[in-house]
Amino acid sequence: MHTSISDATSMPRDWNWSLVDKTIMTGIFTGSFDPFTIGHDDIVRRALPLFDRIVIGIGVNERKKYMFTSDERMEQISRIFADEPKIEVKTYNDLTIDFARREKASFIIKGVRSIKDFEYEREQADINLQLGGIETLLLYSDPRYSAVSSSLVRELIHFGRDVSEFLPKK
């Protein structure tokens, strides 16, 4: 049985590791990160032991309105991981699968908070596998962070609330 989504805690028994470039195991973690939350931070830190290199890709879509500029998001995330040599932060403005291929990614890393997230990520994983041959690795959200989202943080900011508890400390 071959699945397009691999759970970090149990790889399928027939997983074909020969398809993966094992010289440098690279994962990409992508999103708009407007802003980058403690939930995002948790997923990246939990994925770190699985990879030699993680590229955090900040998606930039000209048709989308952001609260923070791509430069501000890049600065925020770079500051958070300044002491982590395995992490790179980059922006991209094309398909995630094209970004993954450019970065020679072994996996696309995604966090899942709910059934709704799972269903969406499952569809995306299937498309990415079909278009680019790259598997998606799902990491389930720590229950402490499952209610945290960038849109929640933006809403709280809009109403002048303190959001520091939802953002990484650096």
Question: What kind of feature is each model-predicted range?
Answer:
Residues 2-18:
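Low-acidity, Ser/Thr- and Arg-rich intrinsically disordered low-complexity segments
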